[in-house]
Amino acid sequence: MTMVETNIKTMSVFANPTPTLSREDIADAVRRAEQRIAPLWPLRNFVAVNPYLGLIDHSFAQAAHVLACRAGARMTLPRSFYAQAIACGRITDDDLAAALAEGIPFRNAPETVAALKAFARDNAPEPVGNVLPTVADLAAKVTGSNWSTIVTDSISNWAGAYFDQGQSYWRSPWAKLPAYEAWRAEAAFDRTPLVRGARAFHRVLRAMPGTAAETIAVAIEQLQVPATGLEAYLHRLLLSIHGWASYARYLRWEAELYGGHDKTLTDLLAIRLVWEVALWQSFARDGVAAAWERSIDEMRHGQDDDEYKRVLGGDLLLQRAFEYAYRRQLFAQLGVAAPGTPVTRKRVQAAFCIDVRSEIFRRALETVSGEIETIGFAGFFGFPIEYIPLAEVEGGAQCPVLLTPQFVITESVDGATPSEVEAAITKRAMRQRVAKAWRMFKFAPVSCFGFVGPVGLAYVRKLLLDTLGITRPVPHPATFGLDGQTRARVKPSLEPRPFNGRLIGMSLPQRIAAAAGALKAMSLTDNFARIVLLAGHGSTTVNNPHATGLDCGACGGHTGEANVRVAVQILNDPAVRAGLREHGIVIPSDTVFVAGLHDTTTDDVTIFDKGDIPASHADDLQRLERDLVAAGRLARAERAALLNVDRNTDIDRAVRRRSTDWSQVRPEWGLAGCAAFIAAPRERTAGISLDGRAFLHNYNWRQDGDFSVLELIMTAPMIVASWINLQYFGSTVDNRVFGSGNKTLHNVVGTLGVLEGNGGDLRVGLPWQSVHDGKRYVHEPIRLHVLIEAPIEAMTAIITKHEQVQQLLDNDWLYLFAIGENGKVTHRYTGGLRWETCA
């Protein structure tokens, strides 16, 4: 017997702990529990993630029960919300009947419309699920000290320093070690557990093995967790440090995307289990041992939660009825779009991201001029690139997080000689270093105290200008370090060349293939206008840690500027156009592609690289810019009501002011309200107000002979839209578990995430202010309704081919409908590769 095994034996509260599971069984349970955690992207590219991603192999109802038992989480709104919707007529008896007709989620849930209405009116306290207890939970009960919070705070404090990405000036001395090793090294010096009363903590710490996998196995053996409850227990532990576990899951996601693996999540689980064993050992004689044995017995034999399931079933039926109410109104709008005035050739075709915020602007632009056709496509416009700014050596992925960048593009200075480019790079790098040194002086532990006195008065002017919204508190990273003249000349460089050990740029065959793929995916292969605008999108906000969450998710949490500028360069290239003819795509010689960026906060559109637009199109461009200004005015007027902007004020000024107001917690509503995804020709939705709630993707199945574009839509944009929809869903129904709380209390930690206040777990999801205006829900949780105009046989074949798509659909995480020739919904997918006709 080794010394470690001897130490472990002597610390057990069981007389003779024996292995109940093989190491392989334990490793398999660890893997399954870790897969239940959804990734959390850092603030620098905060993209929307489905918080239920690890549970999509469960039905929506089953997942609701699992999360109630493992995290005390809700997946529906308070019952009073549905009762009010019934009372005011939003939910009708027909909606309730339709919800009941689909089946009862759990036994003894209401089975009639009358019973369901009575259930909604019931004001009795809502029961919660029997949450699987951890040893920390039991220790809290027997000692009176909140050990669950103490453990989370302790791990979070360590993790904030360990994962820090440049915010702190004193780095952890163990930052280069694997997470578990780094934590053990630091915990050996930490007396907080001893002060708090966990007298066995350091003894347990010393006795544990040196690797995370071995520690987990030893801890499970010591705790005698049965096989029937092991995955649930491990998942419960990870949910107790949900934010940091989610960030570790992101590290693994990124590693796996590029063919690697990351063990940080396993390390965190080992850390959490050390705490469990230590608390068990510390408080065994105070009642924890007996309480834990009862918990183990419940893991073996299950819990009696029939009453909770009855209530949960009723709540899920009300949620389903609420979704039927939305569906009824949406379907009534379709198939009645007014035909536009026939035009042989549009003056402008304007392609926007499918983002729901574009729906309002697209409708406004088409209202301004009937000679403009708008197009919806994922905002990276089919160009999955890594974009490296001038003077940087690495860039960000400008594509959906489901994809990996296929090309690396750098910035250069247009028209500059190599020496001028080098000088611009040197100057920007120097300014960035000086700014970093100055910031270190301001915030360093020693110099910060002497900074305010002699230098503080010099900041009075800037403070006033920032407060008035005239200047930005922090320079925009895209332009920081560049003078005005250089900034105007910076543009993407596509030429293939070696850079920092990599081959960057795009060859001509690569440009032709990418251009053909993008145009086909947009269903834009003929009848080109004189001007084709590709408009990416971004947002303008200040003092907002989650700012990148308002940028383009299809661009990996960045603006779409880089993608549209690259796309336009390629599509205007005569050599590329010549190559496109071999793909059956003939772009007229008088068609010019133009790059733009839609600011979703202000509804202003910026046109890039105007100097590249030929003089022959100068009048066309001026007219387009006037149309964009007019459309922006209409869009701001429509959004003003949701933003609580007084219509008697200068709406344009008031909306723009929000983008520079550093006290504004709701500069815009982002994608709040998202509820539908429609892939069809634009004429199906033209002239219809969808209230900024629908993702609109152009698709013409008649031009998609092999249905490869349909497959792309159902496996990429549809999935991304469901992630966004379910992130907003989770942040609304239970912001405590799936959201990030009160934005006014946020503190950035390590530049990668936020805490609510000065402690607690890293927060996931959206702030409460992103879904609620203080009086009502601006985002109403409705699972995504996907409407596609395509043969149901083609959609069924794609569902069969892709497991994740089938899981999302068969388990009710989103709804799929087919649109017919007349624009009306004809069929609904009901699961198991079956469809039913819609009345």
Swiss-Prot record:
It comes from the Bacteria. Coiled coil: none annotated. It is found in: Cell membrane. Disulfide bonds: none annotated. One of its GO terms (molecular function) is zinc ion binding. Its cofactor is Zn(2+). PANTHER family: INORGANIC CARBON TRANSPORTER SUBUNIT DABA-RELATED, UPF0753 PROTEIN AQ_863. This is Probable inorganic carbon transporter subunit DabA. It comes from Chloroflexus aggregans (strain MD-66 / DSM 9485). The gene is dabA.
